[in-house]
Amino acid sequence: MNDQHPHTPAQPSTSRRRVLSLAAAVGSFTALGGLPAFAATAPPKRPTTSPMLAEGQGSTTRMWYRAPAGENTMLERALPVGNGRLGALVGNDPSHELLFVSDATMWTGGINDVLDQDGQLPYGRTDFGSLTQLAHVTVDIPEHDLGSVNSYRRELDLAQGLVTSSYIRAGVSFERRVFASQPDDVIVVQFSQRGGGHYTGTVSLDGTHDETTSADGAHDSLSFGGQFTNGLRYGAAVTAHSMSGSVTTQGSKIVFTRCADLTVVISGGTNYSADAQAGYRDPDLDPAALARTKVRTAVRHSPTTLLHTHVADYRDQFDGMQISLGPSTAEQRALDTWERLKARTQQGEPDPEFEALYLQFGRYLMISSSRGSLPVALQGPWLDGNDPDWMGDYHTDINIQMNYWMADRTALSRNFDAFTDYCLSQLPVWTELTQSLFNDPRNRFRNSSGKIAGWTVAYSTNIYGGLGWWWHPSGNAWLCNTLWEHYEYTQDRQHLAKIYPLLQGACEFWETRLLTMTVTDADTGKEREVLVADKDWSPEHGPQDARGITYAQELVRDLFAHYREASALLGRNAAYSKTVAGLQERLYMPEVSPKTGWLQEWMSPDNLGETTHRHLSPLVGLFPGDRIRPDASPAALVKGATELLTARGMENFGWANAWRSLCWARLKHAENAYQLVITNLRPSVDGSNGSAMNLFDIYETGKGRGIFQIESNFGTPAAMIEMLLYSRPGHIELLPALPAAWARSGSVTGIGARSGFVVDLSWRDGKVREATVRSVGGRRTTVTAGGISHDVDLRSGESVTLRNFR
C-alpha cells in the first residue's frame, strides 16, 4: 500500500446531523460507557494476600536475555508491557532505562470523508491519520554504566506480567521491575537493591510531538499536554518517590540522590471517547491534568501494594490457561531466549516448553493490549516512532480478525470485548460513509443496482469511523462473522443483542449488492439463476472487477446464516430474516476448477492471480468458516481446498503462515500445521521474516528492513490450539492434528469450544488420557477422539470428565 494518495475534494463532507442520528439509533454511546478507559474512575481492587508466585514457580513462562535493548533496536529487542490501553517498550539498560510509551487512542486524522479521484479513500497520515507515540520516559543512573556491572539478566515473566532486570555492581545486587497496572492505570518502574547500595540520577519525560515538559516541585512530578490539529487532546505525567534519599525537581527533570529504593510512576492518555455523537472526543477531559492525578494517586501506595494489585489482576486472566506440550532438554532450558530461538531453527529439534512459552507470550500480549479500550491494531500499543507502517491501523481483510481468533480459544474471552465495542462505536460513521460515498460513480466497486443500504468498510479503518485505502465490500461480513463466533464460544445473549445492529446493517448492504446471474450446473448441465457478489477484488491480488469471488460468496453465506440464527434467538425481525433466508438459498457457492483441481478463487477455471499469494481468501470457508469439513463435506470439495492450500505453499511469513497452519489443522494434516508454526519461530536477523529477539513477529519488506506485525503473535497460538482441539456447534474433536513433536505427553486447561464449553485435556503417546468438559452456557455437544464419541448434556456450570478414548 502507498503511504499517500493524492486526492481532490469532490463532494460534500459527511453530514454531522446524519451521524448523530445514526449514533443515537444504534446506541453507540454505550460501547465503552461513553468514556475512554483513561477516564474510568472505579477504585482498584486491592488483594488481601500475596498473589506472587513462589520462588522457582513459573520457570517455563519466562523469557530472558543477557543484554539490554539499545535505543535503536527497541522494537526488536525491548520487552513490552501494557494495561490494555497504555503500552511501553522497556529497554532495561542499567544506566539509561528507556521506555517508549504509547496510548492506543493517540491518533491523528479523522472521518476522512472526501474521496480520491478514483472513488477510493485517501490513505495518508494527515487525512486518514495514524497511531503515534505518546512519550519517552528515561531514568538515567550514570554510575551504573553497562561496563561497570556483571551478572546482567533481564526477563519477561509471562505468568505475573512483569519485566525485570538485575545485575551486580560493586558487590551490590540491583533489581528493577516494570509493569503496566490496569487497576491503577499507570506504568510502574520499581528500583530496589540488596547490600547497601543506592541510586542517584534523573527522570525525564519527553513528548514526541515537540511538547514542552513542565515540572511541579510540590509533587515531584513532570507533565506535558498537547493537541493535534484534529482536536484530540493528550497528555502524560511522571512522578518518583523514595522511602530513603532525596527526590526533587530541577528544571525539567526529577532528580533523585542516594536512594536505596525508587518508584517511578507514569500515566498518560487522550480525551478520545468511543462516542460518535460526541465526535469521538470528550470535551471536558483534560488529559494532562488527569495524568498528573493518576500518578500522584498511585504513588501514595506502597511499592508492594502497587505490585500485588497488578499481579493479582493480571493473574486473574493469565491463569485461565496452563499448557504443557511435553518436556524440553536441560540443554535447551539453559539457553537464553534468543539463543534458544536460534537453536530451534539450527538444530531442528523440537523444544516443546519453548513452543508452549510462545503460545503464552501471545496470551500475554492479548491481556496487555486489548482490555477496556480499543482493540489491537497492527502493532498494538508498541511503537518505536510516529510513522508506523500502514499507520498502525486496523486492516479488515485478515489482520484484525486474526488478532481475535486466539482470545476465545485461550481463556481470554473478556479481551474480545474491545473488538466488539470498537465495531459498535464506529458503526454510525461507517453507515454514513457507506450510504453517502460507496455508490460514487468513480468507485469501481460500487453497486451496479444503484441501490445502497446498511454499511461496509474499507481495507483500513481508524478510530474516528474513518475509512482508508480501497473499499472492502466483504469486510462487513468478515467483521460480523468474527463477532458471531464470539457468541458461539460464550453463548452470551447480551453480546448477541449488542452486535445485532451490525449484522442487520451488513445484510441490508448485501441485499442491495447481490446480482442475479445464470450459470450452468456442473453436475446436471442445466442452467440456473444464482446470486453473486458485484465487482470486487480477492485480497490482495488478481482482477479488481471480478463478480462472484469465492471470498465474498463464502463470507456472505455465513453472514446470512448468522443473522438468521441471531434473529431466531433474540426473537427479532422474522420477516426480514425470511428475506435473508431466500437470498442465502440462491447464493452461488464456489466450485472446484476442472483445469487446476483447486477450489476456484474466481468464477473461472483459470488461476487469475499469484499462485503462492500470502492471502488465503478463497479458503475462508475452511478457516475460519465451517462449510468445508473433512468429516462432512463432499470429498471433491475437500480435495479442491487441499490442492489450493498446497499450491499456496509452505514458505511465507508471519500471519500468512499462521493462516496456513490453521487451515492444515482443519484438514488434520498435523505435520504441515506444525511446520508452519516452527517456520514462524525462526529467528529474524536484519529484518528477515521470523521472530525478533523479543518474539515480536517480523515481516521483511526489503533487504535489511522488517516490520513488526502483531497478528501472527496471535494467529500462530490460535493454530497451536486448533491442532489440539477443533470445535463447531454441537461437536468437539480432541487432538485432531497432534504433531509428533508434542505426542509424547501434554496437557492444557481452559481451551474454549464452540457451543459454550471449556475443555481441560491431557494426553500420552498421542492418545487422549482424560478430558474434562465444563459448560459456560452450552447444553449439548458430542466429544470425539480416535474414532470414539461421547455425548455430553450439561447445565451451565456443570462439568463431566471423560476417559475411555483408547
Regions found by a protein language model. Give the residues of each.
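N-terminal secretory signal peptides
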Residues: 1-14, 25-30, 41
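C-terminal region of N-terminal signal peptides and the immediate post-cleavage residues
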Residues: 32-45
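Aromatic-residue-lined binding/catalytic grooves and analogous aromatic/hydrophobic interfacial grooves
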Residues: 44-467, 485-487, 504, 553, ...
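Well-ordered alpha-helical scaffold segments within catalytic/enzyme domains
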Residues: 365-367, 402-413, 478-492, 509, ...
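Short, glycine/acidic-rich hinge or "gate" loops at secondary-structure transitions
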Residues: 373-381, 498, 515-533, 572-576, ...
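Active-site neighborhood of glycoside hydrolase catalytic domains
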Residues: 483-486, 493-499, 528-530, 537, ...
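Non-catalytic carbohydrate-binding regions of carbohydrate-active enzymes
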Residues: 485-490, 494-495, 506-516, 577-609, ...
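Acidic/histidine-rich catalytic neighborhood
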Residues: 505, 509-566
